[in-house]
Amino acid sequence: MTTVLAIETSCDETAAAVVKNRHIYSNVIASQIAAHRPYGGVVPEVASRQHLENINAVIDEALAVAGLGWAEIDAIAATCAPGLVGSLLIGLTAAKTLALVHQKPFLGIHHLEGHIAASYLAHPDLHPPFLCLLVSGGHTSLIYVKDIGDYETLGQTRDDAAGEAFDKVARLLGLGYPGGPVIDRLASQGNPAAFHLPEGNISLPGGGYHPYDSSFSGLKTAVLRLVEKLKTEGDLPIADLAASFQDCVARSLTRRTIACALDYSLETIAIGGGVAANRGLRSHLQAAAAAHNLRVLFPPLSLCTDNAAMIACAAAAHLERGHTSPLTLGGQSRLAITEVMQLYQ
C-alpha cells in the first residue's frame, strides 16, 4: 500500500493531499475565487502569486490532518501538465524540493489523469477498461481508459470547453464568475424548453458529423444574439435562458457519451471535472445510461473540482507500476493525455 503526498497548482486552486490505498487521509484546498472574481476569470500572474503565498501552509495542513510524518510518506507528486506554466512551477518546485530533501521518489502527474483517478477514489472497485467523460473549464474530452497510463481520446471539443462556455454565457447574462454554479442554480428555477438553442456539430469532409466531437462556440454566439434580441424587446428571463443553455449542453454531452460507450462496448462511464457537478448533466446522463443498461459514475462534488487527492491517487497507481519522474521534469502548458507515459523514466 502506497502513501503519497500530492500537490495540485495547475490553475487557481492551491491544493495538497495525502492518499493511501485509494483512501483520502487529507484533502486541503486554498481557493482563489475571491482573488479572480473582480477580473471575471483567472489571471495567470495573480494565480502564481497566490500559489506562492499559500503553498507551504497547504502542505503543512495536509500532513497535519493526515496525522503523518515524512517517514510515513512513500512518494511526493505534483501536477506538471497541462495548465498555467507559472502556476505549475510553484507546485512542481515545492514537490521536487521536498522529494530531494526527504529522499522520496517524485512523480509528475497529468492533470486529466488526475480527474480520471478521482473516480477510483469515489469507487474503489472501478478498474479499466471504461469510458471517461472529462468536462471542465479547460477540457471536454471522451477518453477510452484502457489501463493506467494507456488512454485513447475518442472525442473532444473543437473550440470552447464546456466549463468555459458556462463562464462566458454567465458573463453575457451578468451573473459573475465562476459561471457554472450560478447557471446551475438559476436553471433549476427556469424552463429548459423556453428557448431552442443549437447543439454544435462537427462536419466531416465526406459528409455527416463527427459522432463524438463537440463545439460550444456556436451555442455561445446563439445565446449572445438571443440576449441582444430579448433586451430590445424589454424582457430578459434569466432563469429560462440559463435552463435552456444548460439543457442544450447536457443533451449534447449525453448524446455523444452514450453513443461512444455503446460503439466501443464499454459498460461503465466515469465522469470527471468541474462540470461533473452540474445537476442538469447528471440528470441527463443518469437517465440515458439507465435506458441503455450502462453504469455511470459521478465523483462526489468535492472531487469534481481541482484537488490534490486525485493527483495522489494517480501517482500511487504509477508508483505501484515502478514509474517515477526525473527531478528535471518541467511544467507544460499543453500535453495530450495519450502522451502521459513520457513523464516517467
UniProtKB/Swiss-Prot annotation:
Substrate binds at L134, V135, S136, G137, G138, D167, G180, D184, N278. GO terms for biological process: tRNA threonylcarbamoyladenosine modification. Pfam families: TsaD (PF00814). Binds 1 Fe(2+) ion per subunit. Transmembrane segments: none annotated. Keywords: Acyltransferase, Cytoplasm, Iron, Metal-binding, Transferase, tRNA processing. GO terms for molecular function: iron ion binding; N(6)-L-threonylcarbamoyladenine synthase activity. Fe cation binds at H111, H115, D306. Its EC number is 2.3.1.234. CDD domains: ASKHA_NBD_TsaD_bac. InterPro entries: ATPase_NBD, Gcp-like_dom, KAE1/TsaD, Peptidase_M22_CS, TsaD. Its cofactor is Fe(2+). The keyword Repressor does not apply. It catalyses: L-threonylcarbamoyladenylate + adenosine(37) in tRNA = N(6)-L-threonylcarbamoyladenosine(37) in tRNA + AMP + H(+). One of its GO terms (cellular component) is cytoplasm. It is an enzyme of class 2 (transferase). It is found in: Cytoplasm. Belongs to the KAE1 / TsaD family. PANTHER family: TRNA N6-ADENOSINE THREONYLCARBAMOYLTRANSFERASE, TRNA N6-ADENOSINE THREONYLCARBAMOYLTRANSFERASE, MITOCHONDRIAL. Required for the formation of a threonylcarbamoyl group on adenosine at position 37 (t(6)A37) in tRNAs that read codons beginning with adenine. Is involved in the transfer of the threonylcarbamoyl moiety of threonylcarbamoyl-AMP (TC-AMP) to the N6 group of A37, together with TsaE and TsaB. TsaD likely plays a direct catalytic role in this reaction. This is tRNA N6-adenosine threonylcarbamoyltransferase. It comes from Cyanothece sp. (strain PCC 7425 / ATCC 29141).
